[in-house]
């Protein structure tokens, strides 16, 4: 069998292109305009496990893309967790009910509601159901 150098080159190029395509598939739909404006389809974001059972999240912008503000999606599933915020945070509830407990009081939000939590707040994030919300934090390097 006589295999030409050109055929080998074509095969190698095709394999490399297919491999690169598999490895570079975006995790979710995000469009970055040359102006710096970013559009994200939140319904395509798949959250990953975070710190404890029933808590998942996914940062949707990098520090390079948005150096001053962070943004992501968090999912809570019939759970609660405690934390003290070292950043300012806005939460926009997408699905379910988000409850923020502070000093024995509860601030609650449903789909379309926004909750602001100031830096230094010692709170419990909790939910009686499965909740999905977008978070917006300042500064961007919140973890």
Identify the residue ranges that each predicted region occupies.
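Short, conserved beta-strand element in jelly-roll/cupin
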Residues: 75-76, 85-101
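Conserved short histidine dyad/triad with adjacent acidic residue
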Residues: 55-85, 118-119, 141-142
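Ligand-binding loop in jelly-roll beta-barrel domains
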Residues: 119-143
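Short acidic-glycine-tyrosine-enriched beta hairpin
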Residues: 103-120
């Amino acid at each position: 069998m006589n295999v030409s150098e050109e055929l080998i080159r074509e095969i190698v190029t095709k394999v490399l292109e297919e491999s690169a395509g598999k490895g570079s598939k975006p995790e979710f739909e995000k469009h970055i305009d040359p102006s710096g404006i970013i559009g994200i389809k939140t319904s395509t974001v798949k959250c990953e496990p975070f710190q404890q059972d029933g808590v998942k999240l996914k940062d949707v912008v990098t520090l390079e893309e948005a150096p001053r503000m962070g943004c992501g999606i968090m999912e809570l599933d019939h759970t609660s967790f405690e934390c003290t915020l070292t950043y300012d945070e806005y939460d926009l509830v997408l699905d379910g009910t988000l409850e923020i407990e502070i000093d024995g009081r509860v601030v609650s939000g449903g789909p379309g509601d926004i909750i602001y939590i100031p830096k230094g707040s010692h709170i419990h994030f909790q939910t009686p159901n499965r909740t999905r919300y977008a978070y917006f934090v300042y500064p961007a390097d919140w973890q």
